[in-house]
Amino acid sequence: MPRAFLVKKPCVSTCKRNWSELPDEERGEIYVPVSLGFCPPQPYREPEASVAEPPSCPLALDMSLRDSSYSVAPGPCVVAQLPSEDVSHLTDPQSRDQGFLRTKMKVTLGDSPNGDLFTCHICQKSFTHQRMLNRHMKCHNDVKRHLCTYCGKGFNDTFDLKRHVRTHTGVRPYKCSLCDKAFTQRCSLESHLKKIHGVQQKYAYKERRAKLYVCEECGCTSESQEGHVLHLKERHPDSPLLRKTSKKVAVALQNTVTSLLQGSPHL
């Protein structure tokens, strides 16, 4: 049996070094932090023929296999070196935090098609469109124009008021066709269909969904404005929305008649 299988040879170049053997003036040039996981460079020696000797530095060999950009020095101890690119930003806490901050700001603010952002001068929040900024500015108004008749809470938008009132009346017009759940908003129904039933809504880019006319008195829904008005006349003749709609219809009818009379002088 060969002697190599019986006697284990001492490792001539290990990753651990006896620093007591070095003079003080040479320690600073040779020292490499152990936290980086790198072995100190060793002079090259011709390896002896041995079939049973394992790698003397498995940590450095494992790191060299993970990243092909590391260079491997010849010899029994593999020495891993940093790549040529600048990686100082990975060790500098200040630059690392700034990098993360820039990425977060891109996700939060979004990228405007024209590169212009509309910024709120009160809270410094930015938007990609002027209409979004105009809607946001309403939240800074101290006077709330639209008040809830149930609890007195004020809102600056009729949409927010309508959504809030449904929490008092219990009106849930958007019903799931696959179960018994109903929701106050269309987006909540679409989220329910996607997460619970796995139904993905297919809409084209900027495609408007079919409008649903909801009776805030009883929760009845209609697909057309005419059907909604007929329902109000039959079931809720004293509804303020019906009076408002009647005024709009009367004004539209008067404008139509006026335009017809101006276009036909012989009438």
From Swiss-Prot:
GO terms for biological process: epidermis development; germline cell cycle switching, mitotic to meiotic cell cycle; keratinocyte proliferation; kidney development; meiotic cell cycle phase transition; mesoderm development; negative regulation of keratinocyte proliferation; negative regulation of meiotic cell cycle phase transition. SMART domains: ZnF_C2H2. One of its GO terms (cellular component) is nucleus. SUPFAM superfamilies: beta-beta-alpha zinc fingers (SSF57667). It is found in: Nucleus. Its main location: nucleus. It comes from the Eukaryota. A zinc finger (C2H2-type) spans 118-140, 146-168, 174-197, 213-236. Keywords: DNA-binding, Metal-binding, Nucleus, Repeat, Transcription, Transcription regulation, Zinc, Zinc-finger. Putative transcription factor. Involved in hair formation and spermatogenesis. May function in the differentiation and/or maintenance of the urogenital system. This is Putative transcription factor Ovo-like 1. It comes from Mus musculus (Mouse).
